[in-house]
Amino acid sequence: MNGNSKKRTLLRNARALLGDAMAFDGRPRDMLIEGDRIAAIEAAGTLYAADHVIDLRDHLLVPGLVNGHQHSHEHFQRGRTENLPLELWMHLVRTRTPVKLTPRQVYLRTMIGAIESLRTGCTTLVDDTALGAAIDRERIDAALQAYDDAGIRALVGFAMMDKPIVDNFPFVEKHVPAALAAELRAASRPAPEAQLALVRDLARERHPQSSRVGVLVSASAPQRCTEPFLQAVRSLADDLALPVITHVQETRLQVVTGQLFFGCPMVEYLDRIGFLKPATSLIHAVWLNPREIDALARTGATAQHNPWSNLLLGSGVQPVRELLDAGVNVSLGSDGSCSTVTVNMLNVLGSAAAVSKLRGDEHARWLSAHEALHAGTLAGGRALGFGDELGSLRVGAIADLVAYRTDTVTFTPFNDPVRQLVYAERGAGLGLSMVAGEVVIEGGVLTRIDEAALLHEIERDFAELGPLYAAAEAEMQPVLAAVENIHREGLAAAVASDTYAARLA
């Protein structure tokens, strides 16, 4: 999967979470990496021949985390919002007058997420980035180059849609002034055919099964796409054997929207039109009913849990146990850093396990730390079409892995490595990261880029960009006022009585 086909790296003396079950027996191991694959795992002191040897004594070796959802176009907006539900918040990200960035600034913005991801144990990310008013290949190439340079595995999608944002909502005629609605509908956006052609063109050289930095197919959300466009998106993914992502029922209003737009909740609609298939991830999938969960299980689609984002936006808590009971693959994502402030996947693991404990009194059904780690590794690889090749430390698997120091307060005393990793480690103890068999962090230092210089350049540029973001946000106040009314009407509207309650009353 990369040009690292002959190099042999030996990781010595590491305690590891081994196999698809991530079993831990406490005994140190040697692990031989050949090219981009794990070639051998043996008792410590029994493997020798290698080009590069790294001693991982006092480290815990873990599969690299898979972040199934982030938005690189938000990285310059982290920390700018709080205490807004999704429907209001999103209009501060997609403003009427977008801040125009140079290709270099797009590169730097993308690099923020790549650096934070690598520093917190993530080796694979999905970037669902926005195209904006027009397709700009120079800026798209800049984002892809950032991932190339950082050394992370990235699958990039382009949040495709063919409807104006204002028409994603119900009750528009009632609450949005006609002149404002007309202005929003007239905003420039890429032609549907051009969006599909972009993915088809990029996939020739950047297919995720053959390129560390590849593309996938992103339909932004069912309510943002006409049915013919969704069918075209599905056909494109099938033709190219690419994974698919789409936002589905993140909020209660979106359940109401599905009922009004399609005559049923959105997962039922996607099932009806044949959109649900394996390697198709429904992002968020918070507000679900039993029929929708059955559809996910029957079709092999993935429900992706974004717990930290769903908490900060007040969206709700996904019914993870019900999904797992039905046999649905559940993966994890951070979402964008404007809503979450961070793309730290260790934070996502901990919040996924912790927030499940608010769903019901039957404590045996709460999500465990081990289940959260599985969702953030092997299940994430399965969601993206890698089968069992990504997210597991076993012979033959892709060598995407990380090691955390265990001679730290986080792991002292050393009782349960998975619980201490999921609930306490947040990246400070990361000593090693390897992607596709290449060491990208060693001794806590990023090996492929000058991190300090990049962060300094970002801060220097943002001194000018910050006021532009503030002005763009201020311009959205009339839109926020209208959407506030739509949001409140949606809260009052009924949803199917068997929908799992996602919020505390």
Residue ranges and their predicted role:
Residues 1-29, 34, 374-505:
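Active-site microenvironment of metallo-dependent hydrolases
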Residues 138-285:
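Metal-coordinating catalytic core of metallo-dependent amide/deamination hydrolases
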Residues 237-242, 275-278, 295-304, 325-330:
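Glycine-enriched alpha-helix->loop->beta-strand junction motifs that scaffold or abut catalytic
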Residues 14, 31, 36, 58, ...:
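Divalent metal-coordination and catalytic microenvironments
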